[in-house]
Amino acid sequence: MVRIVKTEFYKLKRYHILWAGVALMLLSVLLTLFTSMANDGSVWDFAYLTEQVIKNNMSMIFPMCISLIAGYMISREQTDDTLKNILTVPISFKKLLTGKLIVCGVLSIIFGLICSLFTIIAEMIVGFPGFEISLALKAALQITAVNFFLYLAVLPIIALTCRRAGSFLVGVIIAFVYGYGGMFAAGNMTLANLYPITASLGMVGYRSYDTAVNWNIGTCSCSLAL
């Protein structure tokens, strides 16, 4: 398994689609900055900027992003007609798939760190009040952790829709709808704790300072595990 994972990391150098992931992380931050221009009475500071980046990542960007990249990586062996050669090594498709999914999990963390960097750069440019090193570290931890938990939330979709070349695009659409559904689930705390997409927020205590927000870590963990 270690060799499979190492090989998949070597292959990443050939995958230009990874730049699409970087671009989508930038888009998440730019979209957040765009919404900050709306005169809706919200008071923007660095903490609120971070919260909005996390929300946009959850609802519109990351589930679709990681499903696209994971599906592309998994389908390459079929698209390039190399799967039959790999299986003669012999390596089972199950082991190959597991190795690719592990790499995708690492990528979700890397994209979280990239998104965190873009968020801090945006803060430096715009200059919202309340920026502190400790808050920046907390923001990086939360953004990165939420990305990883979102990956776990869409993992079943990726695994089920990547069996055939090209079919992963169906998974991308499903993942987008699945992520967008988090916007509606977030309106009810019971549903938010049960819905895997919003459960990722509960795992990092998103807006836990708000008395109306009551996360149940046990329920959130079970939701993601199932």
How would you name each of these model-derived features?
Residues 28-66, 98-163, 204-211:
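Secretory targeting signals
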Residues 20-25, 165-182:
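Pore- or pathway-lining transmembrane helices of multi-pass membrane proteins that form conduits
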Residues 66-78, 83, 154-169, 224-226:
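Transmembrane alpha-helical segments in integral membrane proteins
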Residues 16-18, 92-94, 98, 164-170:
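Membrane-helix interface segments
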Residues 31-50, 172-226:
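Terminal transmembrane helical anchor/hairpin motif
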Residues 73-105:
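Helix-loop-helix units of permease transmembrane domains in multi-pass membrane transporters
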Residues 1-22, 163-166:
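Aromatic- and glycine-rich beta-strand/loop motifs that create alpha-glucan
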